Amino acid sequence: MIQRESRLVVADNSGAKEVLVINILGGSTGFYANIGDIVIVTVKKAISSGAIKAGDVLKAVIVRTKYGLRRKDGSYIKFDENAVVIIKDDLTPRGTRIFGSIARELREKKFTKIISLAQEVL
């Protein structure tokens, strides 16, 4: 469960390394966001040679959470970290690679480009 002021790891090669959530858009509830929800973030740590700089305000989609997600078959999926992928306004990723595994629930939420770039889909 991600809320405002949560710090998240960035799972792509856009140049940002760590972000802070400042708002939740279209979340399942008003206060918490889960896998597949879009959040507004500000960049806290970035690499110096990247296109994204510290302080930039961007949109991102949550791809991994420690809290986990209950699937329709009754199983749960949990990850070791909370992670996001930086996206553009047309919901395509800004980076060209996505690191780590992501949940297949993103396919149901129409993030097919992120699914195709991911190393592993669980």
Curated annotation (Swiss-Prot):
CDD domains: Ribosomal_uL14 (cd00337). GO terms for molecular function: large ribosomal subunit rRNA binding; structural constituent of ribosome. The keyword rRNA-binding applies. PROSITE patterns: RIBOSOMAL_L14. InterPro entries: Ribosomal_uL14, Ribosomal_uL14_bac-type, Ribosomal_uL14_CS, Ribosomal_uL14_sf. Part of the 50S ribosomal subunit. Forms a cluster with proteins L3 and L19. In the 70S ribosome, L14 and L19 interact and together make contacts with the 16S rRNA in bridges B5 and B8. This is Large ribosomal subunit protein uL14. It comes from Phytoplasma mali (strain AT).
